[in-house]
């Protein structure tokens, strides 16, 4: 199939899935998955899995063992951490392309004029927590896979879509755990796209990453009449923060 005709066929399939796209988006936008601590993760992954199955994808859940939650999700209050992976085509076929995004969201905060989990649609826009960062990326993954299947595009390999937790707190229990388990490595993955909320013309390579650490700064006490003999730990803490 010629490239232009192929592109048009896929675009037509995407357009035909507009109602499904909105339904999928509102289905998962309505689930409050605030992190920390990591609310409703099992409910959200179950909803995503339902849509994957509707598309015809093979579905797999990847759970962080309970005994490792304190290590990988120290801010998670012991709540479960689960990723969900969908495979379109033979999961072992190569080459493969893995689209991945996170379903956790930061707390909604204040100042909303709409219900942050009400999925209000106005003037062609969906207003909800996660509609940008970053459940919309997961919606894009699934609609792309669905469009390929609906258009009848033969696959030479596998399209993989995953939804992971905990990006907002470092990702160790999410995409980091998929890497640890071998689901997303240079050996198992030919191509990978992180479906973060950038425009289509801003596909980029790399990520600034994140580090969580705890620093202890020790001062030296002194009498108020002889402050020069003491060491103010706050002064050195400020210097450290300026460097960071």
Where are these regions (language model features)?
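Acidic/His- and Gly-rich active-site-bordering loop/insert found
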Residues: 2-126, 150, 154-155
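Predominant activation on well-ordered alpha-helical scaffold segments within soluble catalytic domains
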Residues: 26, 49, 139-146, 176-179, ...
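Short alpha-helix boundary/capping segments
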Residues: 58, 129-136, 225-233
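Conserved hydrophobic/aromatic beta-strand scaffold that supports enzyme active sites
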Residues: 83-87, 192, 214
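Glycine-rich, phosphate-binding/catalytic loops in enzymes
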Residues: 114-118, 178-180, 210-211
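Acidic/histidine-rich catalytic neighborhood of metal-dependent amide-processing enzymes
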Residues: 126, 134-208
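Acidic-enriched catalytic cores of C-N bond-cleaving enzymes acting on peptides and small amides
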Residues: 205, 224-244
